[in-house]
From Swiss-Prot:
<feature type="binding site">
    <location>
        <position position="431"/>
    </location>
    <ligand>
        <name>Zn(2+)</name>
    </ligand>
</feature>
<feature type="transmembrane region" description="Helical">
    <location>
        <begin position="114"/>
        <end position="134"/>
    </location>
</feature>
<comment type="function">
    <text>Acts as a processive, ATP-dependent zinc metallopeptidase for both cytoplasmic and membrane proteins. Plays a role in the quality control of integral membrane proteins.</text>
</comment>
<dbReference type="GO" id="GO:0004176">
    <property type="term" value="F:ATP-dependent peptidase activity"/>
</dbReference>
<feature type="binding site">
    <location>
        <position position="503"/>
    </location>
    <ligand>
        <name>Zn(2+)</name>
    </ligand>
</feature>
<dbReference type="GO" id="GO:0008270">
    <property type="term" value="F:zinc ion binding"/>
</dbReference>
<keyword id="KW-1003">Cell membrane</keyword>
<keyword id="KW-0547">Nucleotide-binding</keyword>
<dbReference type="InterPro" id="IPR003593">
    <property type="entry name" value="AAA+_ATPase"/>
</dbReference>
<feature type="compositionally biased region" description="Basic and acidic residues">
    <location>
        <begin position="796"/>
        <end position="813"/>
    </location>
</feature>
<dbReference type="GO" id="GO:0005886">
    <property type="term" value="C:plasma membrane"/>
</dbReference>
<feature type="compositionally biased region" description="Low complexity">
    <location>
        <begin position="677"/>
        <end position="695"/>
    </location>
</feature>
<feature type="compositionally biased region" description="Polar residues">
    <location>
        <begin position="770"/>
        <end position="788"/>
    </location>
</feature>
<dbReference type="InterPro" id="IPR000642">
    <property type="entry name" value="Peptidase_M41"/>
</dbReference>
<dbReference type="InterPro" id="IPR003959">
    <property type="entry name" value="ATPase_AAA_core"/>
</dbReference>
<feature type="region of interest" description="Disordered">
    <location>
        <begin position="619"/>
        <end position="853"/>
    </location>
</feature>
<dbReference type="Pfam" id="PF17862">
    <property type="entry name" value="AAA_lid_3"/>
</dbReference>
Length: 853
């Protein structure tokens, strides 16, 4: 404040000085004199036409008042003239004036005033000093020309945003963020328990899982100012700009508190300190230090919540992750089976689907995909349909779109010789048959020899449920699966090819992980080896030396080689035993180019899968399984044996939903229900996502016409299930048009068409939920908005289609949410033509042949 006052006073003084200088400069007494040449003035003196004369010695000029007017430069009636003369001619001019017949003359010897002399010296100094102070002040604040100012964008109500209803497949993350919204809306409930709002929230997870979407949903739901900025916006070429932008950002936030700041890709500025190689000054460290101080330093940060997103939490500085800065760290992982179904249903809104399109089957085939991948699959399917002039998205379009996302587009123009095509058919057949003959690996869902992306073919497995834990036999079965292609080449042609390079790479990763990470090798033991000292540019040490001796490294290499050799032997023996099946499979592949599960079941109907034998010699000698003792049964297994309904596990997610619903009803009864932000245009609420408030709820016995009450709000049934007292009719608030704070009741009466008006608030009406002709219930993802008279869609060629009808999908006994997710070995695609994995692939251990390793 003092600096601002000094600057104001200095500016006023400078303006006054400038005005005085200009006044003294332009207030001259020679305005009425016409300036003429010196010769004209001398001629008037010689002619005696001068009445008065004045010599200004300092300015070296002479002013003459004439007796008779003259004409100067076509100007008539000039009576006063002024002329300049050189300094050395001053005596001659004086003699001329003295000799002329003038009435009077005078000599004016002027001296510069003290004020003018001081102005000529002080004014430039004041201007220079003022400019320096201006630039220095701008450097401390926003920087020169705004270089150091914050680039954060504040979202306003007019900007299109998302809501929690637009987020699917991340229910736990939504619930964690919903708590922040509740705290901002109703802090008294939390403050009564002494709770404080989290000061920082870090969203981390793989790319494409919806971290930024969650932040946009918070912006649409929070109801407070929301600032968004990228981590790279803090990094500039000028020293100190990053720290200045951090200060300016938090200054704006504090002025508008309570508010939320979202920093996307915070790893650009939040990497661990001490990672410089040359020992010099690191501008990023200065920015990070300022960020740490602003998040939890000596100053107050009341009412400012910092959200951040990154897919590299391992490189962040430990001081940034401690409680008090990021109190809550929320993982946003790839969705499970149920989450994929919800995401596909969200992105299926507005897309017409053919009757054979099955969203649930697509969700099972896309294990390991992120939400962005799933959205891309449906978009590719729509583009394929538009390319062929179709009006509905078919199952073939979904399958082709999945293959395009996984392995790339088809290379239809590639010329392949007959011999290479035959080698590819046997190579992929070796993978398929090796997996089919083992119990410890999923059956192959699809095998093809069509060139796609950088692969010449691939075999894909599809799991029934999401798995997160693998035993030794299951991992070894994947090694056998990977070695099947090379074994087929050796068995049939007698020589290997380069097509198995990606298979060898994937198998080596699995085998090395079994030995060095999972402790499955008796020779090495249960010790984690192979941990490098770290990346020298990540702040976690440098050098890259292994943390074990050369003798241990040799033992590890020996064990890895043993696993690969044994898997090679097992796959070779399987193919040699079922050589006839391999020939029939290769023949069918050469004919149809693509085979699916029904075709493979018909070819391999007489193959009995075997269990993997003992992997390591005498592996069960030291720690054998106790005989005649079985593990205990889970409550679900016991309930199924008794023919009872499986018990429902306690869920904090469901309990918090029930609490929010109960709180919503209380506020609704009091007429204090806050207005919920509308969902973004064109996006319907996701299944399983947090439901918004759309006015007074319908009666408890109301249901969609024809649905027998199936579509009642799930939140209405949860309180009693989660141990909360159910609301009795006597406790229910009276239903009235004004019970929600003056808003109209959308559930008042059905419309003339029979469709309840309240369903419009949820994104779809009765006509979308029910088939009016049959009364059958539709899945939202499989509903076409318009029913075309002739359905045209993308279809695969006849020779690529299955000769056998698809069998109904087997429902799993356990719900997909019962399984836990634990990262295992990332698998590689099984391709038969390239030594490199497919571009844009995913780490997916449970879907080994799905070309996403």
């Amino acid at each position: 404040m003092k600096n601002k006052k000094y600057l104001q006073f200095g500016g006023i003084a400078a303006v006054i000085l400038i005005v005085l200088f200009l006044v003294s400069l332009f207030s001259s007494d020679t305005r009425n004199f016409q300036e003429v040449d010196t010769s004209v003035a001398m001629a008037q003196l010689d002619a005696g036409n001068v009445a008065e004369a004045q010599i200004d010695d300092r300015e070296q000029r002479v002013r003459l008042t004439l007796r008779e007017p003259i004409t100067v430069d076509e100007r008539e009636g000039v009576e006063e003239i002024l002329a300049q003369y050189p300094a050395r001619t001053a005596p001659a001019i004086f003699e001329k004036v003295e000799a002329s017949n003038t009435d009077s003359y005078t000599t004016n010897v002027t001296q510069e005033s003290f004020l003018m002399s001081m102005l000529s010296f002080i004014l430039p100094m004041v201007i220079i000093f003022g400019l320096l102070m201006f630039f220095l002040t701008r450097m401390q604040g926003g920087g020169m020309f705004g270089i150091g100012g914050s680039k954060a964008k504040q979202l306003t109500k007019d900007m299109p945003t998302n809501t929690f209803a637009d987020v699917a497949g991340a229910e736990e993350a939504v619930d964690e963020l919903h708590e922040i919204k509740d705290f901002l809306e109703d802090p008294t409930r939390y403050e009564a328990l002494g709770a404080k709002i989290p000061r920082g929230v870090l969203l981390y997870g793989p790319p494409g899982t919806g971290k930024t979407l969650l932040a946009r949903a918070v912006a649409g739901e929070a109801g407070v100012p929301f600032y968004s900025i990228s981590g790279s916006d803090f990094v500039e070429m000028f020293v100190g700009v990053g720290a200045s932008r951090v200060r300016d950002l938090f200054k704006q936030a504090k002025e508008n508190s309570p508010c939320i700041i979202f920093v996307d890709e915070i790893d650009a500025v939040g990497r661990a300190r001490g990672s410089g190689m040359g020992g010099g000054h690191d501008e990023r460290e200065q920015t990070l230090n300022q960020l740490l101080v602003e998040m939890d330093g000596f100053g107050d940060r009341q009412g400012v919540i910092l959200m951040a997103a990154t897919n590299r939490p391992d490189v962040l500085d430990p001081a940034l992750l401690r409680p008090g800065r990021f109190d809550r760290q929320i993982p946003v992982t790839n969705p499970d089976l149920r989450g994929r179904e919800q995401i596909l249903e969200v992105h299926a809104k507005g897309k017409p689907f053919a009757p054979d399109a099955d969203i649930k089957a697509l969700a099972k085939r896309t294990a390991g995909m992120s939400g962005a991948d799933l959205a891309n699959v449906l978009n590719e399917a729509a583009l394929l349909t538009a390319r062929v002039g179709g009006n509905v998205i078919t199952a073939d379009a979904l399958e082709e779109a999945t293959d395009r996302v996984v392995g790339g587009p088809r290379r239809s123009g590639k010329v392949i010789s007959e011999k290479e095509k035959k080698v590819t058919a046997y190579h992929e057949g070796g993978h398929t048959l090796s997996a089919w003959a083992l119990e410890d690996i999923e059956r192959v869902y699809k095998v093809t020899i069509l060139a796609r992306g950088r692969t010449g073919g691939h075999a894909m497995t599809a799991q029934e449920d999401d798995k997160g834990m693998y035993n030794r036999n299951e991992l070894f079965a994947r090694l056998v699966f990977a070695m099947g292609g090379r074994s087929a080449e050796e068995l049939v042609f007698g020589e290997p090819t380069t097509g198995a390079s990606a298979d060898i790479e994937m198998a080596t990763k699995i085998a090395r992980s079994m030995v060095t990470e999972y402790g499955m090798s008796p020779a090495v033991g249960m010790v984690k080896y192979g941990q490098e000292q770290g990346d020298p540019f990540s702040g976690r040490g440098g050098g890259g030396n292994l943390d074990h001796s050369q003798e241990v490294a040799a033992t590890i290499d020996t064990e890895v080689q043993f696993l690969l050799d044994k898997a090679h032997e097992v796959s070779y023996s399987i193919l040699a035993e079922y050589r006839d099946h391999l020939d029939r499979l290769a023949e069918k592949l050469l004919e149809k180019e693509t085979l699916r599960r029904p075709d493979l079941e018909a070819l391999f109907d007489d193959i009995v899968p075997r269990k993997v034998a003992e992997v390591f010699p005498d592996e069960s000698t030291r720690f054998p399984r106790q005989e005649n003792r079985e593990p205990v049964k889970t409550p679900v297994e016991l309930a199924l044996e008794r023919g009872e309904e499986p018990p429902k596990k306690f869920s904090i997610l469901e309990a918090s939903r029930a609490t929010r619903e109960r709180r919503r009803k209380e506020l609704e009864a009091q007429g204090k229900l806050p207005v919920q932000p509308a969902s973004s245009a064109g996006v319907a609420p996701a299944a399983g996502a947090a439901a918004g408030s759309y006015g007074t709820p319908p009666p408890a016995d109301w249901s969609v016409p024809g649905s027998a009450g199936k579509h009642r709000s799930r939140a209405e049934e949860q309180p009693a299930e989660q141990g909360f007292p159910a609301q009795t009719p006597a406790q229910a608030p009276e239903q009235s048009p004004d019970s929600s704070g003056g808003r109209p009741n959308p559930y008042a009466t059905p419309t003339a068409s029979g469709e309840h008006p309240g369903m419009k608030a949820y994104g779809f009406g009765d006509s979308e939920l029910m088939d009016q002709s049959t009364g059958a219930e539709h899945t939202p993802g499989n509903v076409s908005q318009e029913s075309p008279t002739e359905m045209i869609g993308f279809r695969l060629p006849d020779h690529e289609r299955s000769d056998y009808p698809e069998k109904a999908q087997k429902e799993s006994v356990l719900d997909a949410s019962e399984t836990t997710e634990m990262p295992v070995v990332p698998d590689q695609p099984i391709d038969g033509d390239s030594g490199k994995s497919a571009e844009g692939t995913q780490e997916n251990p449970e879907n080994e042949g799905d070309n996403r390793g």
